Amino acid sequence: MNSEWSLDILYKGFDDPKFSEDLTSFEKKAKELDELSKTLSHENEKKDLLQIVKVLEEFELLEKHLSCFGSLSQSTNTANAKAAAAIDKVATIASTASKAMAVFSRYIADMKDLNSYLDCPELCEYKYFLNDIHESGKYLLSEDVEEALAKMNISAGSAWEKQQSLLTSSLEVEYDGKKLPLASVRNLAYDVDKEVRKAAYEAELKSYAPIADAVSFSLNNIKLQVITEAKMRGYTSPMDMTLHQSHVSQKTLDALLSAMQKYLPVFHKYLKRKAEMLGYENGLPWYELFAPIGKSATTSFTPETTKEYLVNHFRPFSDDLADMMEEAFDNNWIDFYPHKGKVGGAFCCNMPFVKQSRVLTNFDGGLGDVVTLAHELGHAYHGLNIESHRPLNWEYSMPVAETASTFNENIIMNAVIDETEDKEVKLGLIENQLQDLCQIICD
């Protein structure tokens, strides 16, 4: 089992002839979209709609192949110049199709009898997708403005995002006489030694000083772009735009936030009690948020034992899920360990066009890392279930995306707690759950 993922199923590298061929095909497909956008007529709506869907599917497949390879390559090495160049090239080509995309969206939004075309086999699976475009027409800008926004994003919000990622992923932290990646130092927040937790926290904060202004500048400009675009499109706020794009109503969000606010006093009580158990009288220091309580589970996991643990616990629930987990470990879907230049945190990238996913994590061998992998493999399972969908139906909103992953977390944590007989270890496990919930609700 390799500790690094393989991207060979996409391309062998940026010098792979197939990468160049697909890049050329992608550019041609963008031009084809532009040409198609100039031939539309409401006298031939069904015929036009069929052609739009066909070309968009082909465009989507090429873009996914190319962009996934670029972004995944860069996520494990943010200094990879070839990856950065490829990402910019793909984004630039995609932006040339933005005007055509706006024309298609406006054309669909103006259709009077859209649903009458959606019974045919080629379009029936896209009923939701096409109706969503139809209903979102009021937020469209002119074709020229849509094109300008897409092109400017490459050197605006997208560029600021890349800068923030590069600065934090390449940051080295001076700790205990050594230089460590930021992700490794942040993992020390879970150490059993209070002095280690405090020293790591202070070292982390100190390391931010040289990049603090640049990161703040990046984040502020990302948000400014969102605020500006939301206003231009006619949304009442960035939140209104996000809710619309996520297919969540304000009423639903208000209900969720209301429930969270109702239970905040319970979390405050938990944090005060944790502070007392750790010997603090005036509340819990920030660097102690992840301090272990009770007895830590002594098991230290490797990728091999993590695979066995997850597969054994998910097999009784779902053979499909367990089989997919085995494939992920055996076929190099996962990039495990932190190192300089690798982005922090964890994520899953679905690649339904090759019937696989890729998972990045900063594995340190603790139970929390096992839970993180269960979470990310939940996203991969979601990817497994969209493989049979047509390309334009592969996208889904965040509320949907987090369903399988959060479910997986609960499955694994509940199983671990039930299997533990030592009360102090059980306390530690329950506290781990409370930590996670506290981050979601309070942070």
Where are these regions (language model features)?
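Conserved helix-loop functional segments at active or binding sites
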Residues: 312, 316-323, 349, 379-390, ...
